[in-house]
UniProtKB/Swiss-Prot annotation:
SUPFAM superfamilies noted in UniProt: Pseudouridine synthase, PUA domain-like
Role played: Could be responsible for synthesis of pseudouridine from uracil-55 in the psi GC loop of transfer RNAs.
InterPro entries: PsdUridine_synth_cat_dom_sf (IPR020103), PsdUridine_synth_N (IPR002501), PUA (IPR002478), PUA-like_sf (IPR015947), PUA_sf (IPR036974), tRNA_PsdUridine_synth_B_fam (IPR004802), TruB_arch (IPR026326), TruB_C (IPR032819)
Name of this protein: Probable tRNA pseudouridine synthase B
CDD domains: PseudoU_synth_hDyskerin, PUA
GO biological process terms on file: box H/ACA sno(s)RNA 3'-end processing; mRNA pseudouridine synthesis; rRNA pseudouridine synthesis; snRNA pseudouridine synthesis; tRNA pseudouridine synthesis
Name of the coding gene: truB
Protein source organism: Thermoplasma acidophilum (strain ATCC 25905 / DSM 1728 / JCM 9062 / NBRC 15155 / AMRC-C165)
């Protein structure tokens, strides 16, 4: 199995101790490739879902990182507190909240607004509380626990934390780093079925997103950088509104790209998707030609055509060539560019009797 051709995700169960970047390094060493990155950094003492992007999937790290995260954690209150009080303060911290990142964080310490979608009490024993939280990406759970303790008047802190999902990647897909290394070793010996079963393709990242299936006729234009227009759509799977992210896939269910919807699914017109990621490979040089009318006069990689000896531009009205316009046939003066830009000098050979202005600066350049 050629590991350099892997383009997808593997969900690892990060243990306590190593940093997320250390896990990146180990996966690179195991596979022998460089294109590896994790989605959503975990602190060294936090365990759970650490999704690794491999190959082309590395380009989707920022997209998947936008997805909500889920955690199970343990919080300790400094004073006695009842279950009813815990539920009350958990409800207070559900919805949009203000957060100040901790002192030891990778981002600037400025007040931010984050969304907590749900915060549930699972179990309570004495001053210890087991909870489940689903929150917006970038929410600090340690800070959340500290803030709850402060507002309750009891004081408190996070004791333990485990991430259970990042977007569509959940812990039921997790494998340990040791298991992953063993699967790779088997794949090197030709037994790659187990490894293939645990590598999720790039479309899996958009399992919960609305999707647009494009016509084959539109694929070439997209590969060359075009956005998606209404005429290139074959099927729309799911509802979306203007400004939401959508996934664009081929008729063969391969990921073509992803971008922001420029209209709603109920009112399709003109430009539909503004791509920020395209995964199609363009045919190098194909259709990249210089034309006069409908006739191709310069194909990529071939010798220079006699009619395009100069830079591209408008048709020269004197010569009939397509190139930069040389201007009128007789011009008394010309403007020199560069450091003497703006000064007007006579053409060379004009008025050699000394009646013209003296030239400066660029005579010998």
């Amino acid at each position: 199995m050629d590991f350099s051709n892997i383009n997808g995700f593997v969900v690892l169960d990060k243990p306590q101790g190593p940093t997320s970047h250390q896990v990146d390094h180990w996966v690179r060493e195991i596979l022998g490739i460089e294109k590896v990155a994790h989605i959503g950094t975990l602190d060294p003492n936090v365990t759970g879902v650490l999704t690794m992007a491999i190959g082309k999937a590395v380009r989707l790290v920022d997209v998947v990182h936008e997805s909500p995260k889920e955690y199970v954690g343990v919080m300790r209150f400094y004073e006695d507190i009842t279950e009813e009080e815990v539920r009350y303060y958990f409800k207070k911290f559900t919805g949009r909240i203000y957060q100040l990142p901790p002192v030891r964080s990778a981002v600037a310490r400025s007040l931010r607004i984050k969304t907590v979608y749900s915060l549930d009490l699972l179990e309570k024993k004495d001053r210890l509380v087991l909870f489940h939280v689903k929150c917006e990406s970038g929410t600090y759970i340690r800070t959340l626990c500290t803030d709850i303790g402060y507002v309750s008047g009891k004081g408190g802190q996070m004791v333990d934390l485990r991430r259970t999902s990042t977007g569509p990647f959940s812990e039921d897909r997790c494998i340990t780093l040791q298991d992953f290394a063993a699967m790779v070793e088997l794949a090197r010996k030709g037994e790659d079925k187990l490894l293939r079963d645990h590598i999720l393709d790039m479309t899996y990242a958009f399992k919960d997103y609305p999707k647009i299936v494009v016509k084959r006729s539109a694929m070439r234009n997209i590969a060359h950088g075009s956005d998606l227009y209404a005429g290139g759509i074959k099927i729309i799977d799911g509802k979306f509104r203007k400004g939401e992210r959508v996934a664009v896939i081929s008729e063969d269910n391969d990921l073509v790209g992803t971008g922001i919807a420029m209209c709603s699914s109920d009112n399709i017109f003109m430009k539909v998707v503004d791509f920020d990621h395209i995964f199609l490979e363009a045919d190098d040089g194909k259709d990249n030609v210089v034309r006069i009318g409908k006739e191709a006069v310069q194909k990529s990689g071939s010798g220079l055509h006699k009619d395009i000896q100069r830079s591209e531009g408008r048709k020269d009205t004197r010569t009939g060539w397509y190139g930069r316009d040389t201007g009128p046939e007789k011009t008394a003066d010309r403007v020199w560019k560069g450091k003497n830009k703006g000064r007007v000098y006579p053409r060379s050979g004009a008025d050699k009797g000394g009646g013209g202005k003296e030239r400066h600066g660029r005579d010998h350049q």
